[in-house]
Amino acid sequence: MLPKLKISAFLLKRLERVKQQSSGCLYGVFYGDGTLLLLSFNLSNVGQLNYEQIQHRFPAELDLCGLVKFGDCTDAEAHLNEVIKSVDITDNPILLKCELGTLVGMRASFFVHGKLEEVPYDVMDSEQLYNDFCFTRLQCGFYLQTAATPECVAKEMHVLRKRVADGNLVFKVPHTNIYIHSCGPMDNKLRGESRINDLVQAIPIPSGKENVVADKKKSKTAAQTQLAKHFGATGCEYDLINIDVMRIRTRDLLARDSPPHPALSIAVTTEEQTRAQVPLEIEAMAMLCKNTKLQRLYDVLIESICRALRLFEQSLNEHLAESEGGSLAVPRSHHFYPQGFGHFLSCAYLEGLGDDEPIMQERRKRLHRQFSLPVTRPYFRRANQCHFQGEVDDAPWTPLLNTHVGVRPSAVTDGKEYLVNGNYHYYHYLQQQVQDKGWGCAYRSLQTICSWFVLQGYTNAPIPTHLEVQKYLHKINDKPSSFVGSSQWIGSTEISMCLQGFLKVDSKILHVSSGAELPTIASELAMHFQTQGTPVMIGGGVLAHTIIGVDYCVQSGEVKFLILDPHYTGADELATIQIKGWCGWKSMDFWSKGSYYNLCMPQRPILY
């Protein structure tokens, strides 16, 4: 019986954007009673497949399952037999045939007894994905004692993977008494026949946070549970299960309580070969259908560790091949959640190799090409890595994220929405104990804009404070010394200066002689959100706001603006902010007809 085929809506959008003849590999999850869900693809190098370089970057359970062909590419047929031999999760590998730049005419076929059999498919949208699937994230540590040769690294990594798979590890779900070992789960209520969803429901929400969730819940999709809000990745709506790792002999935590020392230690063995003891801090992920039986979880977690070790091995051996003298370095796991993918990807980067070094730039460029991503914006820099909510909550304070999600519609007849592209934090009056009511609105708009560049991975610079802004403007001779420490407001020109000074970001300044003329720049704002996607600061008189979208009807000229209002002075309660209109759609009567307005429109740097 052939598998039932489903395709992620995220994947379909990515396939639609490919406009060059090419071929590549497909990756998916096999779950339930015979359903294959396609989630991702990569493009192959000209004339050869490269899935062996790619597959360890995916979470465990997200595996090679077939081939995709774009246009009249002839490589696909040549590679089909190779892929068929390498697919493990199904006896019927899949072939997708896509036209260039469109989903019209896309055909899906399973390979059955040496022939292709065309099959229908269903589309799984984002809400169903978030409902039906979750991720695990575990952290553990090992030491790798090896000589600085690819052969020795491969040999010792193989030994280490065998140790991982020998049944001596036990997994524990934090904040519970639930243990997972090679014979199944150990808990009074959960059994091997229990489902992953039962485990999700058994994980308690940290005390004191339930009310916060209730306040924010109205703006989230129904699929997003409290577990996603408290432990998931920033900007990601999947539930996430954290896992601790223990050895069955000692019950000692391998990772969270005692991570390995981050330095290399050197030893000389009797083999007359210098060996280094490399600390490996593993951070591994897996993707699971929530209806999966709990008895499978142990094997999946073991595979996630082994997959992370293979990624470390690949990174170490690449470095040994490229570096003169063959030196070892400490690898680190970095997880990414690229916008529009609908799944995580992992990279292993070596300590001591900065993001701007040519060798790192070349590796990222290769990743961009393999995943059909533009090389005009960052996806895999360290600053792009995921921030997980449990870790973010440990910080003294974090602003609200993406406050526009869930706002009431604009009600523009036949309008089209153009929105900020990516994540941002909402900054407003009185945050961080700064008494800036009446003068700090533009500073707050600047902080919101800076947060966008941080969260999109363009920089990891800290968000500038009011005082830092004032000191910088004095430093460049824009303001007198009396400005530093004052309560004087700033405008769009100063915002553009600060963006250049703090982030090296250029800005475009638009001038409008009155609020009544704002509709004349609606199309320009729409183009800005399509091409740049950054928040826009608008200043008029002594007031500043942040524009994060427009809804515009070309035929009628009707336009509304999606506004973040920095003048809000209340608590960070999302429901209040949306209901009271501090974040929401504003019509033309929001703007003063007698005031001129300047808009600071930040431009994305070309960076990857």
From Swiss-Prot:
Family annotation (Pfam families): Peptidase_C78 (PF07910), UfSP2_N (PF20908)
Keyword Hydrolase listed: yes
EC category: hydrolase
EC number: 3.4.22.-
Record flagged with keyword Calcium: no
Keywords: Hydrolase, Protease, Thiol protease, Ubl conjugation pathway
GO molecular function: deUFMylase activity
A single GO cellular-component term on record: endoplasmic reticulum
A biological process term (GO) from this entry: proteolysis
Positions annotated as active site in the UniProt record: 441, 565, 567
Gene3D superfamilies named in the record: 3.90.70.130
Role according to the record: Thiol protease which recognizes and hydrolyzes the peptide bond at the C-terminal Gly of UFM1, a ubiquitin-like modifier protein bound to a number of target proteins. Does not hydrolyze SUMO1 or ISG15 ubiquitin-like proteins.
Family as reported in the entry's similarity comment: Belongs to the peptidase C78 family.
Name of this chain's protein: Probable Ufm1-specific protease 2
Organism taxonomic ancestry: Eukaryota, Metazoa, Ecdysozoa, Arthropoda, Hexapoda
